[in-house]
Amino acid sequence: VEGSLVQFETMIMKLAKRSGFFWYSFYGCYCGWGGHGLPQDPTDRCCFVHDCCYGKVTNCNPKTATYSYTEENDGIVCGGDDPCKKQVCECDRVAAMCFRDNKDTYDSDKYWKLPPQKCQEDPEPC
């Protein structure tokens, strides 16, 4: 794993105070690789919105583009001169804040390693 996926993990640790890999890689219909069906809860919606955000990125690969950011107070400020990399940073920043803001509705008993048949509905548009 390289580029922004490592940076995304770091942001999640900073803002949500938990590992993105361990908490969000296999959650709901959208957290982790791919995504199908309808978001199952607010945390899964964070991942859906993040996937949509990555889908709108042009001129760089959001999974490998390395961006710059600074930590200020308890937040993240995206920087740099490359508009594409800055957009990737913003996608990650918004998702990490979303995870933080929805920790109280996270339900591992219900949505961790959700069977694929639970994610068969037609997806909503981004």
Swiss-Prot record:
Q: What is its EC number?
A: 3.1.1.4
The subcellular localization recorded is: Secreted
The entry's Ca(2+)-binding residues are: Y30, G32, G34, D51
A GO molecular-function descriptor = calcium ion binding
What are the BP-aspect GO terms? arachidonate secretion; lipid catabolic process; negative regulation of T cell proliferation; phospholipid metabolic process
Q: Which organs or tissues contain this protein?
A: Expressed by the venom gland.
* Positions of disulphide bridges: C29-C119, C31-C47, C46-C98, C52-C126, C53-C91, C60-C84, C78-C89
Q: Which UniProt keywords apply?
A: Calcium, Disulfide bond, Hemostasis impairing toxin, Hydrolase, Lipid degradation, Lipid metabolism, Metal-binding, Platelet aggregation inhibiting toxin, Secreted, Signal, Toxin
Which reaction is catalysed here?
A: a 1,2-diacyl-sn-glycero-3-phosphocholine + H2O = a 1-acyl-sn-glycero-3-phosphocholine + a fatty acid + H(+)
Q: Which GO terms describe its cellular component?
A: extracellular region
Q: How is the cofactor bound?
A: Binds 1 Ca(2+) ion per subunit.
- What cofactors are annotated for this protein? Ca(2+)
According to its UniProt record, which residues of this chain constitute the active site?
A: H50, D92
Give the residue range of the signal peptide.
1-3
Q: How does it assemble?
A: Homodimer.
> Function of this protein?
Snake venom phospholipase A2 (PLA2) that inhibits ADP-induced platelet aggregation. PLA2 catalyzes the calcium-dependent hydrolysis of the 2-acyl groups in 3-sn-phosphoglycerides.
Q: Which family does it belong to?
A: Belongs to the phospholipase A2 family. Group II subfamily. D49 sub-subfamily.
Its protein name is: Acidic phospholipase A2 S1E6-a
Provenance organism: Calloselasma rhodostoma (Malayan pit viper)
